[in-house]
Amino acid sequence: MVLNLPQELLEEILCRVPATSLKQLRLTCKEWNRLFNDRTFSRKHFDKAPKQFLITVLEERCRLSSLSINLHSGFPSEEFTGELSPIDYHSNSSQVIIMKIFHCDGLFVCTILKDTRIVVWNPCTGQKKWIQTGENLDENGQDFVLGYYQDNKSSDKSYKILSYKGYNYGDQEFKIYDIKSNTWRNLDVTPIPGNYFTCSDYRVSLKGNTYWFAYDLKDEQLGLISFDYTTERFERLWLPFQCDISDHDYSLSVVGEEKLSVVLQLKDAPRREIWITNKMDDETKEMSWRKLFEVEVGTRYYMWSGRPFLVDEEKKIVVCCEKCQKKCQPVITVSMVEADSNATRVYFPVVTMTSYWPHFVDYVPSLIQIQQSEANEKELNS
């Protein structure tokens, strides 16, 4: 009976069904399966699908464990949602070690330790694409971030990967990989003079662009640097007030797909401030900040400098996490702190990689497809 609905109405209804549920419906109807594979529908679904908090943690076995945080049931609660991995552990890839992950638009790019490949992966559909980098990816600081540019007429998104080794005010080499054309090329771009990433692992994606904390040596101030995948240029952005790197703790996150968020605290100050941007101007790149709320500082609030966090703007709740020991067992401690500083704590038992911290993403399971080449289909992908 549902199939007798007008196509436009049917698509509008299905766009509001979580991707994880749609995935289970693929085999029930050929028409729906074709629809779910349609790029236009996938994009429409991603834009309208309900968002959810998802924590991903690199485990000792190099899989990603996930924990869903529900802030909309009156009282914050958590649910273990299982293990995820782009690697088939029953294959000859069992020695593959995921070193870093970066999330953009429902997709992950995973850096593989001591390998020459990275992998772009959709956890919801299981689709993945292995990409040769031409370099052995050891722990020398090589990083890969994913972004996109959007066609103004068709609204189609084309994905790119930026490759770099840190970022500083000296000589630097950047490369870009276009997923559509399956090609690497050197990027002729000049870093912002006198600026360097305070930590290249503190990076987030918003509206297809990538953002990092950066320190200006001349002004001696902490700020942000963004990379625009349309112009392929870096931009300097400012924080809500002047911050010296030696005097402040700081963390960076996103609120939905619309705003940036930072936690700032003058060292030894009694309260931490949570700031978010107003909607940024896509043309001028200008943005303004407003303080959402403050929370008291205490040892029971796990919000140290650079640690991942998420913010619910409507409920004024900040969610943050930390590794710790509980009864001699490694656990992830998730704290949900409200504007009145009331805190709820969740313990997430998981065997983590020794040197890795939990990785927070404001994640929407999506049906977005990763463009493949004929050669890539034959890549050692098992």
Curated annotation (Swiss-Prot):
Coiled coil: none annotated. SMART domains: FBOX. It comes from the Eukaryota. Residues 1-49 form the F-box domain. Pfam families: F-box, FBA_1. This is Putative F-box protein At3g49980. It comes from Arabidopsis thaliana (Mouse-ear cress).
